[in-house]
Amino acid sequence: MRHNRHINHLGRTHSHRKALLSNMAVSLIKHKRIFTTLAKAKEFCKYVEPILTRSRNDTTHSRRLVFRKLCDKYAVSELFREIARKIGDRPGGYTRIIKIGNRLGDNAATCFIELVDYNELMLKTAHGGATNKIRRSRRSSPHKRDINERNNIIQEDNAMTKTIEEAKGE
């Protein structure tokens, strides 16, 4: 019986799941936003939140503990140098899951998972930027609406990466 097992195995062995979550964490630290399935994202939050909390205290011991999970020295240095500075005053909840819809091939629920303090578009709207209302026709099909929403999210993501690259260049 499966009593008291609080981990989603994601259909993988222990070593495969450990490698998957570690690689996803490195990608999130490097790119600040990743695209994945909802089940992986929910399990990934449980994995990465303690790592981000550990990075707030920059000691040799905490660096070694984080490196044990990530196994990428560039990701560890970026985590302690840049990300820890931004999340230093936040008491928790460093990641955000944005549901996108279902994948066309296998109908899996997909989402973006991102670091909360790195989404400039949401930060601008939260600090007083006006949002535009979306007007929808009654005749539009839900399938077309899902595709349009995905395209809008991808365009926003591309625009955000361009602004981040321009900011790094300056």
From Swiss-Prot:
One GO CC annotation: cytosolic large ribosomal subunit
SUPFAM superfamilies linked: Prokaryotic ribosomal protein L17
Pfam families (UniProt xref): Ribosomal_L17
GO biological process per UniProt: translation
Molecular function terms, GO-annotated: structural constituent of ribosome
UniProtKB keywords: Ribonucleoprotein, Ribosomal protein
Family as reported in the entry's similarity comment: Belongs to the bacterial ribosomal protein bL17 family.
NCBIfam families from the UniProt entry: L17
PANTHER family linked: LARGE RIBOSOMAL SUBUNIT PROTEIN BL17M, RIBOSOMAL PROTEIN L17
Quaternary state and interactors: Part of the 50S ribosomal subunit. Contacts protein L32.
The protein, known as: Large ribosomal subunit protein bL17
